């Protein structure tokens, strides 16, 4: 499955079910850089996922969300 399809069809529903503050999850690629964007009501979080497979993207994004949530409290 392509990364963009994975992020939009699998990762986005999972993350939005886990956190009501997440409005959308998107994937973007410019040149060799790949990012997952998590959009909240007051902004967004961009996570560099270059070179990762779908499982790696899921793990990294969840770890970053947990770390981001802890630092905001």
Spans of model-derived segments:
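Mixed-charge, Lys/Arg-enriched low-complexity segments
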Residues: 2-8, 56-73
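Intrinsically disordered, low-complexity peptide-like regions
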Residues: 6, 17-19, 33, 39, ...
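Short, flexible helical or helix-coil boundary motifs
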Residues: 14, 18-29, 64-73
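Compositionally biased, low-complexity segments enriched in small residues
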Residues: 18, 50-53, 62
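Acidic, low-complexity, intrinsically disordered interaction modules
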Residues: 23-56
